[in-house]
Amino acid sequence: MADLRLNYVLLEMKLKPEEDNTKKAATWSYYTRDDVKKFVKKANNYGIDVIPEINSPGHMNVWLENYPEYQLADNSGRKDPNKLDISNPEAVKFYKTLIDEYDGVFTTKYWHMGADEYMIGTSFDNYSKLKTFAEKQYGAGATPNDAFTGFINDIDKYVKAKGKQLRIWNDGIVNTKNVSLNKDIVIEYWYGAGRKPQELVQDGYTLMNATQALYWS
């Protein structure tokens, strides 16, 4: 990478969780803190910034398989380990604790929360609790997309307090009625779902071209 003058690498990986409210997630393959620190140090020596990603609120099965209490349940009561229940304050706290654990290992000024494909293979219609939560939290007429956007903004506020800038994927960003996505978030445009890039730029958002047509093989 250094020879090609590439200076960023996005690392979606699992750091061994060690906090009391996360350590049951120490399954699958993971890296230790020493492993990651050595990797980050070597990358930094070559001028490469290593950006960690824990995708949320979707794609969370490697973290939530042993935490059913944080999994989102559909209208029939069936829980999905891929989906964090953003209406549950304890589930949100769980994700923030993971951020804290990574923060002590990575030196970058960025945090990537993914935020893509939350409803892949399904729709918000099957999760009426998010509609109820959205209206309670964000007012009359709020939709699950408002709740989703509000969750992203909450994480943005959390990482900003740590001196970091939030990065997300684009496909979950839609026009919302009650909650607007924070403008300081970097949107990595990888897929043609959600709002068009021209609209986002016109509204003052910072975009990075990460289109799958060019970079996903």
Residue ranges with predicted function:
Residues 116-121, 127-217:
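Catalytic-core regions of glycoside hydrolase
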